[in-house]
Amino acid sequence: MKKYLNKTPEEVIKLVTIEIIERAIKLGRKNNRTISISKTSGGKGTNVEKLNPKTEIGKEQLEKFFSSIRRHYTFSGLGSPEEKNSINWRILNLPFTRRLLVVFQVALSFVLKGTPFKNKLYRWMGIHVGRGAEIMQLVWLDHFRPELIFIGENTLMGAFTRLTVHAYEGSGKFRYGLIEIGNNCKIGAGTGMGPIRIEDNVRTLPGATLSPYFSNIKNGSIVGWNPPNVKESKE
């Protein structure tokens, strides 16, 4: 996972998306399917063949596609599981060997308490973990694409917290995005979140659900209650 080190969130999601585009082209040709990528969850997609980084025209179109980096992308056209030429979204995402390795790493980290070794393990997986961060036991950090998760310095992740960077939407369609948690945050036990940006000094109450209700939590906010709401800092 070294190629994701010292990269900004925007650089990482661009790298990840190019990797998936290349796999989509290969699998689409093999299974005779047209796969598209969209910058929105429901918008009209672009045929991945037009974004082939191995051709000159494709490189140009790819740079235009990334002229503005989005925080999430959607792939469609994989087909339903019952179709003979359908493509499993898990196979599109990662090769089998890496999927197996990441699942093993997640299983091991799942039972470890907040220790320096655990942080090193997460970094080895590709997760960006800041200095002084504490990740308690039974925290679920999505193994779909661990490198899309950024946890700031001196941030506490309470037990049973769930971070999910992807969503499978059925009918051969899935999306993924970035999760960014700032510095000095306290994420309460059992908090659940999808792609989101959380600024510094944010506190979530136990059991809070942050996505899809919010896409950005401002500095110093307190998030919780049912239904969820945000109490912003007066500073």
Per-region residue spans from a language model:
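Terminal amphipathic alpha-helical/low-complexity segments used for targeting or macromolecular assembly
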Residues: 1-126, 220, 226-235
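Left-handed beta-helix
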Residues: 105-180, 190-196, 210-211, 215-216
